[in-house]
């Protein structure tokens, strides 16, 4: 057996000790402003023009003390498992929303309230979230929910944006690795569309591991956005990568990079073409309503078969051939096109959405007749976003660039007209993946800002050891030229982000006492005869002890309680402060118990008092000048 390392075809190893900047040979500049001058035909900076450009770039992103950003940005946390909230254009981090991870600051994954939301999946303490998206009405953000996928454990979560907390998590049955996630845009977000990436046998019980078996497949998944329950699943040929939906409510589409159903790198690149699969949502709904569906593996979810049979299309899907291994799938903000990004091809494929009716009615001999352009943009196109002025912006992973191109001119060039549809190429640092322009996935794309999420930062920041931050770059696209104005280090590993106007997100200042987030805890207290806003009592129920207390900075309602060694202890605290931003905390030392209690919130946590002796609890939040004195004692008597 050879001891030679496996090599990716075409890959080149960087010499050890050589910086990324030198190896890539991008000629990247040290200042963000200079990078903004890489437009085609841009001139050389003079000392004066350098100073002017630097001043302009700084003013673009400066948000002064006490001033507010124009946009909310929602970033996926990747394999860290959370969602991050940033202000744009300042790129200041405002909040982290734990979802699939355990968070000791807020107690997410530790409190009883969060465990109820996590459900059976609470056993997983990891997640891999990629694609955050906000619910819509009539193609515009309504600010109600944000949805996020978990590729690691095949889940989809919903975040209530009024409280910036996750309120529902669904494990998608019959599939593995929920990756691409998008929402129905029109008439409203009725469905969350979620792609399962990996092909698996059905049933997946070890009876076979043959991916070529007819019962080995993956599925396109639709989730009822309000109920957070499965609506339907569609069996497909090949696998599924990224997806998007149209502006009519009729169609969704997904890329496929493994039409071969292979399990190795070489096999996945064997076919010269893969495809975009388009789903006819109305036909799927009609079939399910008529009872024309099956169920799988003991699940009750309606399943329809969207695979071809003997070369004949299913009524639910159409497969449009595109160059091999496409990645991103993006709907233009004018609602005209699905853009499939080539990845291994230097092209993107523009699919005319207004031709899809004819495609489903079998009026084309070749499904590629719905493709109206296939512009060549550069090496490694991954994702495309839009400015609402007819221009598209595509990340080029291999070239470490973003390319601005005009969609109408690309169509004219495809028809044979000599026109230069590429408007500018801008170096970014380095290897960009997702990108997102302000409001671009809605009908209100305003063409002001572009965020490019670069997978490598290398020499852009102070060194942090072998693990480097990512680099989220902010680009001004309000004028004719793209201008890089900010580098933002990010912990591993954001994949995508979205930008919404600040007026589209309405948040609560303090909790409503009737909030469903802790309604179950309120109901349990009621059974114990407890008024959570006034009572400070201990309820003993066999081996279980329920401790109820209020908190008002800087004191807990109970400063001492006694239990027996081995008791299961549930501490329930209600913050009766009514002042905005006066959050309290509760930590029981040496018991792994920690949680947040914000104004008017009730939180509870359960642990075992397994160590006899005195154990202090304290407020972990700096809620008052005397917060150090906000303490109490648990006295654990020997069993």
Swiss-Prot record:
Q: Which top EC class is named for this enzyme in its record?
A: oxidoreductase
What Pfam families would the database entry show?
A: nos_propeller (PF18764), nos_propeller_2 (PF18793)
Q: Where does Cu cation Z2 bind?
A: 130, 179
Q: Binding positions for Ca(2+) 2? A: 257, 260, 268, 274, 325
Which amino acid positions bind Cu cation Z3, per UniProt?
131, 434
Has keyword Transmembrane helix? no
Q: Which SUPFAM superfamilies match?
A: Cupredoxins (SSF49503), Nitrous oxide reductase, N-terminal domain (SSF50974)
What cofactor does this chain's UniProt record say it requires?
Ca(2+); Cu cation
Annotated residues for binding of Cu cation Z1? 327, 383
Q: Which residues form the signal peptide?
A: 1-54
Q: Which InterPro entries match?
A: CcO_II-like_C, Copper_CuA, Cupredoxin, N2O_reductase_N, N2OR_C, NO_Rdtase, Nos_propeller, NOS_propeller_2
- UniProt-annotated binding residues for Cu cation Z4: 495
Reactions that this protein is recorded to catalyse = N2 + 2 Fe(III)-[cytochrome c] + H2O = nitrous oxide + 2 Fe(II)-[cytochrome c] + 2 H(+)
At the top level of its lineage, which domain of life is listed? Bacteria
Q: Where does Cu cation A2 bind?
A: 619, 621, 623, 627
How does it get modified after it is made?
Predicted to be exported by the Tat system. The position of the signal peptide cleavage has not been experimentally proven.
Task: List the EC numbers from the record.
Answer: 1.7.2.4
Which positions are annotated as binding Ca(2+) 1?
Answer: 455, 470
CDD domains the UniProt entry points to? N2OR_C (cd04223)
Task: Write out the ranges of the annotated region (COX2-like).
Answer: 543-639
- UniProt keywords, alphabetically: Calcium, Copper, Metal-binding, Oxidoreductase, Periplasm, Signal
Provide the protein's localization: Periplasm
Which GO BP terms apply? denitrification pathway
Family recorded in the similarity comment: Belongs to the NosZ family. In the C-terminal section; belongs to the cytochrome c oxidase subunit 2 family.
Subunit text: Homodimer.
Q: What is this protein called?
A: Nitrous-oxide reductase
Species of provenance: Pseudomonas fluorescens
